[in-house]
Curated annotation (Swiss-Prot):
GN (gene name): xerD
Domain Core-binding (CB) intervals: 2-95
Keywords: Cell cycle, Cell division, Chromosome partition, Cytoplasm, DNA integration, DNA recombination, DNA-binding
Protein name: Tyrosine recombinase XerD
GO BP term, pick one: chromosome segregation
Main location: cytoplasm
Catalytic residue list: R160, K184, H256, R259, H282, Y291 (o-(3'-phospho-dna)-tyrosine intermediate)
């Protein structure tokens, strides 16, 4: 194995063993660093000790530009900034371990992303989406019951899709109407669950899950696929897409849009931004405050259309 490949693997091992980085995050780092490794090798660099600050800066430029010849798409500012985080971590590790004399990525600044407001659904659209999933008839099968429970839980708790499909049976208490979510970095938070979501979960756990569980090997996962294994993020995404299509919602709907809707509707209902921060599992209230801009934007539109001196 080449020196550069060994150095990259050493950093990934460090993230796994010593830092306990989540599997999804590790997968993203591996993908970004593979791209960085290719960038360096194309310049004849096979050792981190030979990398200069300009090599890192040029990598960032290449990410934003893309490469039509190789079919590599240009990355957004957000995606490029994420890739730079992985590269910075690599060079910080290299300097600390004596693999390189200096941390050459330290001074490279990430691109500034445009401040786009997160898209959310209206309350009526969410209700149509949930009803489109079915699960409210005695004749509904186990997969329909599961689909309704997944969507109700996502909207009721604001959970990330990975948090929802990662739930085990011990993580939810339908009597106390609460669920234990495991977020980024292994951080846990106890979140209340609304009554409609509890009803959907009870229906699935009693009438749906046992049938699915008999097809599998005894996993503790709450949400099971048709073969009795843990439901994947991709399959949960498809559940949402199918429900949106049945509800006649033409705009692209993603699991994160339900999370955005959860936060926006809470703030519109008068919830304190720091409470929403805790419910979402954000490390900083600054991340949550983007949703306050959504509600202010909606108020501004109403004001502009109704106030005689708005124009």
């Amino acid at each position: 194995m080449k020196t550069l490949a060994l150095q990259l693997q050493g950093y990934l091992d460090h993230l796994t063993i010593e830092r306990g980085v989540a599997a999804n995050t590790l997968s993203s780092y591996r993908r970004d660093l593979r791209r960085y490794s290719k960038h360096l090798e194309e310049r004849g660099i096979t050792d981190l000790a030979k990398v200069g600050e300009h090599d890192v800066s040029e990598f960032l430029v290449a990410l934003r530009r893309g490469d039509p010849d190789s079919g590599t798409a240009a990355l957004s500012a957000v995606s490029a900034a994420r890739a730079l985080i992985a590269v910075r971590g690599l060079h910080r590790f290299a300097a600390a371990e004596g693999l390189a004399e200096l941390d050459v990525a330290r001074a490279v600044r990430p691109p500034t992303p445009s401040r786009r407001l997160p898209k959310s659904l209206t309350i009526d659209e969410v209700l149509s989406l949930l009803e489109g999933a079915g699960g409210d008839k005695p004749s509904d099968g186990p997969l329909t019951l599961r689909n309704r429970a997944v969507l109700e839980l996502l909207y009721s708790t604001g959970a990330r899709i990975s948090e929802a499909v990662g739930l085990d049976l011990d993580d939810i208490d339908t009597h106390a109407r609460s669920v234990l979510l495991r977020g980024k970095g292994g951080k846990q938070r106890l979140v209340p669950v609304g009554r409609p979501a509890v009803h959907a979960l009870d229906a699935y756990l009693v009438r749906g899950r046992p049938d699915l569980a008999r097809r599998g090997r005894g996993t503790a996962a709450i949400f099971l696929n048709a073969r009795g294994g843990r439901l994947s993020r991709q399959s949960a995404w498809q559940v949402l897409q199918d429900a949106a299509e049945r509800a006649g919602i033409t705009a692209g709907v993603s699991p994160h849009m339900l999370r955005h809707s959860f936060a926006t509707h809470l703030l519109e209902g008068g919830a304190d931004v720091r409470v929403v921060q805790e419910l979402l599992g954000h490390a900083s209230v600054t991340t949550t405050q983007i949703y306050t801009l959504v509600t202010v934007h909606a108020l501004r539109e109403v004001w502009a259309g109704a106030h005689p001196r708005a124009r």
